[in-house]
């Protein structure tokens, strides 16, 4: 394969990934692995070296004939020039450039790049994949538990690559300066704005970006490869020397120097590695003293002037002497050149005094750990000796983990093997401190910086352990380790700097509950109480000691002291002293340690607060009043925030009360304690919901406290922790209901106002200055807003209406009104509507997308933008619930309207959003961002914006069109589309593995398609349809649109096509179902159908592959379905749903292909569904298993709905009926929101527990029992929901199958042979008929579908009758038996008690098809002559024995009491049955007499007649029903037993009125033929009336009726006379004969 192919290295990468995922049993043979590796040896040995441009290759290229892919090709001048451009750009052989350009041309459209840009992409991609393979290879060979054969094979192969002459290590080392120079040249070229020798056809910015990122990544990967080669002992001394020479040439700071340091460390470890001999002696493994001496001289004894950076010399030197000393202490025979004092100790001391620990922090820690990130709390006390600032682009996390792992190894070795040096360092620092204290040498006005290596070592340890929390756990788990011993040894120091550094180390080691418990226990030993600070210095620290220190400083630094006098408490103003720097650092360290411990464990925090001797809350607030540096005061506020971090209930309320009281009563605001009053910032009048003065002095005092930026951030974080609801139930306010009631309106409104005004001010500053500080403050404010919005339990409002007072009784003080009026979310929502606030939110959303995508963007900006998106999403979500489920029921809920006034008086936030066009564009861009934190919020906001139902309970499709127009017309529209494509393609592999997680993008698109009805919508634009506002689609082939291979639509099809590779894929992920639903919807939508189907057809056999790949449910699965878990049932549902979508797509395509006559595709589809090319069918009805694929899809008919739960889960103590809104006759499309149900029951149980008697243990035991019941309830509800979905999916699948079957029968019969067609029809009937015969309530939906299928296909099954001759009828016994079985099944289905009207309507239609067909063929050519053979056969099919009384009961009830088609068909069938045979007719008349049916039918039919006449409806609307009824009445009237029941005076009146009405419409010849036929039927009845009833009887009964009869006669005669001179239709001839007969009868009666 060509090296420029994107899949060139894929096979090797796959093998290596398989081995790495399971190294002990990789299921990969070593032989196969070596064969694969050997095929890449040439690439590895060549490494990144390129054949340079040369004259011979240039001459061949310019000749116009070039060998590409083993074939000689003629190339044009443009191709030659582009190849030369690449050659100049990359300094690459011209022929190779031609091959590379060919690959670029092939992929340029898919990549949406020019051919040269695409070629550059493949060039750098090949290099990246080569290095990735080598990195994986060297990493795998170093795995500890690697299978032995694989390990041996890999080591042998790598050894061959590293041999002399083919030295991979040397090649890597030599490549580093080459790449370094290239990076420098690229940066210079970018600064200069031009590239020497590059043709203008190459996009300058594209090349700069691609080449710079590629070369930087290559440097990092090579450093990893070298490190891993050194770890597996494939590094030689010469390689070490080469790297050492390279290191000497680097300045500080230099990224490459930092990258190669781990390799040098790894080599030193291998050189100094020891081995244990059988006699228990230990010796050097390499056993080469000369090498050790040479390394020592090169690192330690080399002159400083040989190093451009002494810092790197010291960093490498301290590592060398530490490891060398460790080795010397383990081996028995120490090398002769080593003298501990001179070689190790003195060298180490010199390096340490030169500041190596500080340099390690500056050069190896700071580049990977920003000061504002968590884990850098110790940085405030660290003084770096170097003024170097490191500003690198982000480095791979794996490299950072390598560096910190090596640093940790160094620190552990230094503590274990250099304890004497540590003791010396400590003693020197103590001596220096005592000397400086006794004899200060500083000159007034001059500050001399002093550095203490022992303290710097503590800070180095802090920086190392905070990198990886698991290392902290390892530290505390091993109390026998040297590191733990070093920690306990350090506790006894009395030097301020050491105390500070040691305390900060402890704070850094406190990152989880276990470490917090360990530190708490370590400091919990009792200590005698002392009175002054000097006495405190003689003891080891404890919590009592620390709080005594706090109280000591309170007594000396608080400006106003509270004293006890004879008249009570009084305040005494004092002159507070100043705190020195060392004391301030100690105080800050102690506060930080306390903060770290209480933050990790709520129980420890509670224990602290319950200790009246310590009283931390009051102590911290008193400390806050002292005259302290700002950094200490900020640390105090952070300590309060740590106390609030996990606080709940009364503890949280106590913190709120203390804070509120402190702001009102604190001496800080009575006496100027260093805080000047802060002026109110200039804020828009609409930025706050209330005037500033309305908040009283409390808000002013908050402003005075938070003058400093860091103080503002810390205070807002404190408010966030106090406000955040930590309870799972989230049903009560997180502050006391009466907070501040004695001096203001109770609640936390001043704090909300402060956060809002702070957010507005910081937003303005960010907009103007773009400083990081303001963005950090914005982030803190946004976190507070999120905590407030999340804390509003909207479920209380929802369930309050459903469950009435039961919810309200469980609220704090049983008052929902108080909960709503005091909850800060309501006032915050109102504030969010002010222009200055939502402008700040939108400004964050509109932050430059390119800046966000830059790898150097600060993380703070990213998380702040993400937080703003979360708030916008939460507001839209909250409003949706309020508008839809709360506002309409405010009166019912008992909520005052003014509480939720904002939801009524203000427009929806959705409308606010729609006015920010640029925000919507940026929001859509964020979907495609590399920062995954934006995706969910951005997608959900777009979902709310396109949702037309959730806001104000009204649909407004224009908003969906507006949103689509905004994005479609934006300059970034194409970029947005590509962003959606990239995000989907980067996610789908992950979603495939999760199986039950949906794609947010596909969910948005699917919902939008359904809501918009497939017309002009955002979903169509994103999928790649170029649609105009007039709903016209243009098929474009540009990338991004469906006409190109680069579009989201084609990505979906690629994704779906991948599923067809393996047959019988059981685990159908949700994302696959979503993709199929979208494509199926596009196929069925009239606007997109043609384009979508053409795209599918462009993929040969895709639909056929999808059909073939669909799995079939096994009998075992069907039998066990009732016992499946909810996850297993969902898996079956997804499988069935995917099948449904495939059948829907296929049905749409078949219908389209049949309509345009594309028989080629029809043949393919028919062959896949009916398998005409795989099975030889006989002409007889086979009893074997069906060979039709489409019938295999009906495996779902074997599922018994009774095995799936229809009833509600019944668990004692749970009344689930109150959560139901729709639940009808056991069939349910209602699903439970399991999470909400569990929440409300937890609320009930906790409230009930508080009222229980007994001990705390008994209450807890009772609650545990209830929780176990809740778990069972959750499982039952989830299973119930899964069953509901499964039944819906089964019904959907049946409907799709019925449609597809109908299309095959109706549209494809011409492309199916008669044999196959007949066999298919009867196979379908045999499959579905048994289910129709006997069904129950649970199978009604299934039978409704299958009975419609029978009605559709039965006429086709009967078509052979027309081809049979009478003499052939007796020989086709199998055919007649089949029809007989169908009739029996239909009759039984009609009689079934659980059949509804729709089912019976289908069955009547099927039965009528049979009756109609046989009626046609029992009359020869439509005449009166009856074929006795056919009639005899027909009478044998339907005998009186089949027509039971139960069947007649159902049939006559439908004829009497139903409407529409069911009534019409039942009447027609009754009429037909009278003509089947005299026996059946006699049987029917006897039944009529027993049930008095005829009179009842006449009454029902007369009522229908009367309604028609009174409503003035058009006769044509009900014509078919009238005809059916009239035919049956004619039949009744022709029988002497029922004629008198038919010819009632009421019916005669209605009949005469109808005839008069028809005569009024003009001449009879102008009536439409169907109406003429109805008139014929009426005239037949009229003649029977005149023949059976005398005019005298009519006159005696109703003289008006008699007059109407004579009037009707004249009208009829006039109508007939009017058209006498015209050619008459058969209907008119019949009417004319009947009119003449009527005239003669009337004349006869007159005579």
UniProtKB/Swiss-Prot annotation:
The keyword Plastid does not apply. Keywords: Cytoplasm, Nucleus, Transport. It is found in: Cytoplasm; Nucleus. One of its GO terms (biological process) is nuclear pore organization. InterPro entries: Nup186/Nup192/Nup205. Its main location: cytoplasm. One of its GO terms (molecular function) is structural constituent of nuclear pore. It comes from the Eukaryota. One of its GO terms (cellular component) is cytosol. Functions as a component of the nuclear pore complex (NPC). NPC components, collectively referred to as nucleoporins (NUPs), can play the role of both NPC structural components and of docking or interaction partners for transiently associated nuclear transport factors. Active directional transport is assured by both, a Phe-Gly (FG) repeat affinity gradient for these transport factors across the NPC and a transport cofactor concentration gradient across the nuclear envelope. Belongs to the NUP186/NUP192/NUP205 family. This is Nucleoporin nup186. It comes from Schizosaccharomyces pombe (strain 972 / ATCC 24843) (Fission yeast).
């Amino acid at each position: 394969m060509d090296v420029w192919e994107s899949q060139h290295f894929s096979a090797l990468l796959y093998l290596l990934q398989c081995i790495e995922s399971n190294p002990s049993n990789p299921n990969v043979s070593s032989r196969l692995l070596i064969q694969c590796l050997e095929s890449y040896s040439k690439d590895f040995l060549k490494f990144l070296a390129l054949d340079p441009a040369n004259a011979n290759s240039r001459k061949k290229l310019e000749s116009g004939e070039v060998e590409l892919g083993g074939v000689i090709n003629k190339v044009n001048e443009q191709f030659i020039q582009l190849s030369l451009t690449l050659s100049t750009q990359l300094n690459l052989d011209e022929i190779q450039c031609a091959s590379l350009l060919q690959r670029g041309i092939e992929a340029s459209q898919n990549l949406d790049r020019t051919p040269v840009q695409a070629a550059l992409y493949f060039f750098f991609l090949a290099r990246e994949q080569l290095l990735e393979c080598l990195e994986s290879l060297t990493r795998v060979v170093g795995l500890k538990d690697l299978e032995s054969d694989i390990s041996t094979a890999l080591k042998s192969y790598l050894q061959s690559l590293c041999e002399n002459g083919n030295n991979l290590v040397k090649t890597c080392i030599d490549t580093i300066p080459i790449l370094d120079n290239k990076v420098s040249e690229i940066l210079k070229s970018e600064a200069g704005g031009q590239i020497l020798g590059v043709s203008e056809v190459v996009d300058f910015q594209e090349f700069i970006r691609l080449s710079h990122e590629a070369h930087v990544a290559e440097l990092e990967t090579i450093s990893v490869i070298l490190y891993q080669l050194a770890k597996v002992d494939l590094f030689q001394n010469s390689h070490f020397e080469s790297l050492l020479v390279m290191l000497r040439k680097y300045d500080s700071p230099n990224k490459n120097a930092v990258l190669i340091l781990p390799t040098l460390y790894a080599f030193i470890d291998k050189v100094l590695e020891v081995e244990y001999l059988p006699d228990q002696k230990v010796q050097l493994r390499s056993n080469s003293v000369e090498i050790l001496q040479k390394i020592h001289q090169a690192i330690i004894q080399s002159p400083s002037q040989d190093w451009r950076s002494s810092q790197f010399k010291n960093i490498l030197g301290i590592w060398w002497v530490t490891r060398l000393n460790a080795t010397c202490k383990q081996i028995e025979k120490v090398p002769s050149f080593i003298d501990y004092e001179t070689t190790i100790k003195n060298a180490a001391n010199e390096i340490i005094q030169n500041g190596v620990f500080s340099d390690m922090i500056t050069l190896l820690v700071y580049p990977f750990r920003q000061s504002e990130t968590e884990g850098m709390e110790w940085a405030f006390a660290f003084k770096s000796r170097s003024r170097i600032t490191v500003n690198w682009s982000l480095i791979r996390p794996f490299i950072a983990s390598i560096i910190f792992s090596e640093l940790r190894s160094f620190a552990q070795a230094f503590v274990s093997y250099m304890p004497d040096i540590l003791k010396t360092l400590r003693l020197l620092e103590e001596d220096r401190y005592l000397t400086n204290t006794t004899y200060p040498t500083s000159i007034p006005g001059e500050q001399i910086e002093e550095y203490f290596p022992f303290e710097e070592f503590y800070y180095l340890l802090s920086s190392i352990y905070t990198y990886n929390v698991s290392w902290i756990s390892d530290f505390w788990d091993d109390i026998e380790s040297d590191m733990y011993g070093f920690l306990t040894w350090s506790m006894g120091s009395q030097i301020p700097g050491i105390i500070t550094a040691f305390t900060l180390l402890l704070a850094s080691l406190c990152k989880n509950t276990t470490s917090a418990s360990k530190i708490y226990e370590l400091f919990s030993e009792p200590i005698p109480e002392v009175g002054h600070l000097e006495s405190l210095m003689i003891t080891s620290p404890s919590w009592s000691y620390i709080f005594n220190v706090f109280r000591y400083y309170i007594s000396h630094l608080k400006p106003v002291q509270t004293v006890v006098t004879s008249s009570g408490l009084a305040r005494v103003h004092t002159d507070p002293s100043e705190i020195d720097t060392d004391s301030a650092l100690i105080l800050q360290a102690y506060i930080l340690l306390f903060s770290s411990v209480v933050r990790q464990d709520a129980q420890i925090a509670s224990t602290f607060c319950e200790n009246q001797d310590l009283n931390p809350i009051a102590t911290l607030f008193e400390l806050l009043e002292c005259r302290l540096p700002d950094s200490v005061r900020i640390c105090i506020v952070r300590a309060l925030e740590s106390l609030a971090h996990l606080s709940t209930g009364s503890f949280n309320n106590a913190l709120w009360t203390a804070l509120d009281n402190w702001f009102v009563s604190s001496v800080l605001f009575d006496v100027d304690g260093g805080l000047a009053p802060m002026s109110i910032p200039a804020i828009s009048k609409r930025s706050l919901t209330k005037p500033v003065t309305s908040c009283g002095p409390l808000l002013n005092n908050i402003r005075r406290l938070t003058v400093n930026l860091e103080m503002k951030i810390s205070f807002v974080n404190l408010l966030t922790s106090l406000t955040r609801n930590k309870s799972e139930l989230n049903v009560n306010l997180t502050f006391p209901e009466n907070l501040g009631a004695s001096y203001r309106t109770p609640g936390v409104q001043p704090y909300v106002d402060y956060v809002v005004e702070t957010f507005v001010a910081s937003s303005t500053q960010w907009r103007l200055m773009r400083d990081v500080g303001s963005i950090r403050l914005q982030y803190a404010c946004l976190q507070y807003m999120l905590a407030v919005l999340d804390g509003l339990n909207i479920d209380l409002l929802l369930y309050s209406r459903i469950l009435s007072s039961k919810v309200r009784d469980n609220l704090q003080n049983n008052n929902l009104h108080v909960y709503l009026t005091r909850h800060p979310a309501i006032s915050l929502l109102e504030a969010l509507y002010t222009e200055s606030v939502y402008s700040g939110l939108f400004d964050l959303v509109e932050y430059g997308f390119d800046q966000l995508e830059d790898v150097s963007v600060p993380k703070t900006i990213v998380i702040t933008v993400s937080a703003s998106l979360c708030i916008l999403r939460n507001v839209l979500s909250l409003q949706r619930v309020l508008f839809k489920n709360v506002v309409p029921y405010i009166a019912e809920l008992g909520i005052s309207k003014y509480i939720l006034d904002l939801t009524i008086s203000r427009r929806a936030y959705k409308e606010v959003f729609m006015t920010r066009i640029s925000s919507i564009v940026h929001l859509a861009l964020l979907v495609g961002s590399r920062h995954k934190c934006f995706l969910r919020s951005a997608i959900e906001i777009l979902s709310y914006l396109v949702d037309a139902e959730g806001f104000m309970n009204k649909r407004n499709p224009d908003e969906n069109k507006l949103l689509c127009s905004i994005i479609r017309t934006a300059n970034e529209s194409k970029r947005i589309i590509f962003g959606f494509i990239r995000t989907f393609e980067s996610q789908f592999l992950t979603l495939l593995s999760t199986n039950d997680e949906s794609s947010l993008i596909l969910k948005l698109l699917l919902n939008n398609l359904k809501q918009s009805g497939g017309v002009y919508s955002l979903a169509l634009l994103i999928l790649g349809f170029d649609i105009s506002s007039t709903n016209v689609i243009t098929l474009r082939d540009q990338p991004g649109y469906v006409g190109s291979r680069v579009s989201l639509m084609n990505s979906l099809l690629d994704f779906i096509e991948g599923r067809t590779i393996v047959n019988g894929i059981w685990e159908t992920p949700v994302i696959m179902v979503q993709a199929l639903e979208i494509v199926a919807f596009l196929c069925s939508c009239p606007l997109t159908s043609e384009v979508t189907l053409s795209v599918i057809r462009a993929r040969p056999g895709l639909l056929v592959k999808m059909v073939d790949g669909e799995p079939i449910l096994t009998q075992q699965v069907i039998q066990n379905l009732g016992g499946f878990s909810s996850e297993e049932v969902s898996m079956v549902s997804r499988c069935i749903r995917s099948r449904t979508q495939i059948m829907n797509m296929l049905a749409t395509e078949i219908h389209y292909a049949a309509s345009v006559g594309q028989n080629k595709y029809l043949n393919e589809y028919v062959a896949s569904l009916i398998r005409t090319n795989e099975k030889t069918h006989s002409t007889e009805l086979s009893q074997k298993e069906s060979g039709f694929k489409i019938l295999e899809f009906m495996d779902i008919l074997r599922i018994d709905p009774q095995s799936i739960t229809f009833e509600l889960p019944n668990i004692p103590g749970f009344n689930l009926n109150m959560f139901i809104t729709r639940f009808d006759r056991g069939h349910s499309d209602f699903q439970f929101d399991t999470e909400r149900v569990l929440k409300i029951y937890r609320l009930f149980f906790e409230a009930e527990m508080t009222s229980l008697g007994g001990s705390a243990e008994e209450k807890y035991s009772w609650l545990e029992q209830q929780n176990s019941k809740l778990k069972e309830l959750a499982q039952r509800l989830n299973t119930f929901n899964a069953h509901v979905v499964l039944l819906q999916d089964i019904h959907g699948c049946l409907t799709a199958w019925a449609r597809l079957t109908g299309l095959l029968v109706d549209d494809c019969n011409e492309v199916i042979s008669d044999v196959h067609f007949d066999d298919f029809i009867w196979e379908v009937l045999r499959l579905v008929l048994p289910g129709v015969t006997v069904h129950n309530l649970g199978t009604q939906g299934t039978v409704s579908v299958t009975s419609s299928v029978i009605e559709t296909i039965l006429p086709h099954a009967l078509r052979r009758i027309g081809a049979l001759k009478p003499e052939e009828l007796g020989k086709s016994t199998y055919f007649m038996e089949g029809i007989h079985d169908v009739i029996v099944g239909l009759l039984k289905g009609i009689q079934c008690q659980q059949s509804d009207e729709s089912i019976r309507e289908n069955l009547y239609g099927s039965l009528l098809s049979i009756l109609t067909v046989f009626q046609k063929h029992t009359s020869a050519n439509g005449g009166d002559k009856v074929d006795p053979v056919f009639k005899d056969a027909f009478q044998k099919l339907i005998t009186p024995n089949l027509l039971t009384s139960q069947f007649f009961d159902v049939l006559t009830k439908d004829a009497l009491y139903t409407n529409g088609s069911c009534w019409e068909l039942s009447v027609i069938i009754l009429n037909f049955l009278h003509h089947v045979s005299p026996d059946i007719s006699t049987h029917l008349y006897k039944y009529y007499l027993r049930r008095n049916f005829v009179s009842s039918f006449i009454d029902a039919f007369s009522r229908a007649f009367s309604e028609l006449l009174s409503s003035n409806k058009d006769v044509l609307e009900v014509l078919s029903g009238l005809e059916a009824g009239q035919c049956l009445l004619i039949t009744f009237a022709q029988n002497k037993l029922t004629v008198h029941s038919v010819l009632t005076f009421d019916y005669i009146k209605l009949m005469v009125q109808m005839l008069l009405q028809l005569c009024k419409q003009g001449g009879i010849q102008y009536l439409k033929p169907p109406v003429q036929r109805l008139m014929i039927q009426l005239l037949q009845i009229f003649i029977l009336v005149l023949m059976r009833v005398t005019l005298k009887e009519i006159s005696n009964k109703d003289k008006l009726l008699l007059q109407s009869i004579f009037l009707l006669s004249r009208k009829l005669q006039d109508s007939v006379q009017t058209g006498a001179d015209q050619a008459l239709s058969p209907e008119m001839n019949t009417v004319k004969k009947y009119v003449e007969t009527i005239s003669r009868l009337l004349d006869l009666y007159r005579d």
